[in-house]
Amino acid sequence: MKTLFLAASALLASALCALPARAADPDPASCQLVRMGDAGWTDATAVTNLTANILQGMGYRTKTPMIALSVAYLSQQIKQLDVFMSDWEPSAASVVGPYLQKGAVERLTTNLSGAHYTLAVPDYVTAAGLRDFKDIAGWADKLHSTIYGIEPGNDGNRLLLGMVQHNDFGLGKFKVNESSEQGMLSQVSRAIAAQQPIVFLAWEPHPMNMHFHITYLTGGDKIFGASASVNTIVRNGYAQECPNVGRLLKQLVFTVQAENEMMQAISENHVPAPLATKQWLKAHPEVLDKWLAGVVTTDGAPALPAVRAFLGLQ
């Protein structure tokens, strides 16, 4: 009898395991619009538009307003923004930290690891001896005592301004040129064309790493950290209110190479971001299997076939 009972139990367990997994429930109607902030950097534009394409394929509507880092988390706190995928750490820790501490936002996942975010120089400047943060001060005259940053209020600029203010590395007499990502890149391009020395805020992933021959300076870990990662931040409670979108966001993890490819299409080939990221997804459909595991459309169907159809894949 015991043997028969065990055998029957085993058969029942086997039959249950063979049943298809129950699809997740669709999100409520209040989740149908997903508001994602685009910081305006090319990497931010790439990942935000890629995510928007996937969500649209699942039946969601999306808004991707351009938003400065300094107000992104405030917008999430007052529930005017749901998702922000460009929390660069550790450089932005002081910006997002207060909102994390008071529970206004939640760090959902790390969407990129192995990134760089620090000062860089052209390779010919490295060859001439500027290799480390401690070398910069000795090049003051050649550099016109200037470090090129990006837009005002950016976390990297704030770190550079603090470095100058505290005379770190003897840079108290330097100035930080604040403009924009494109403004900085234009300045770098002109300097390289003229073989002039320049120090600038650089990061990877970014097409600049393929377009320019540059070296990231050593010795700046106390300012920028040893390495960089990028996190997805959601407003407090969002992943619980909209668990299907939350599952997708937790599973969206990128590589440096993937972002470089999308960013190159956007910034150098001048392909509009929605189209560039859609083309990248069509060329790399294998990423969808993991990203969409257990995810459903707005009406509860498996998301993978719907997104593939949206992208024009067989």
Regions found by a protein language model. Name each.
Residues 81-85, 155-222:
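Ligand-binding pocket segment of bilobal, Venus flytrap-like solute-binding proteins
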Residues 256-314:
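C-terminal functional modules
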Residues 41-42, 63-75, 175-187:
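Short helix-initiation/N-cap motifs at beta->coil->alpha
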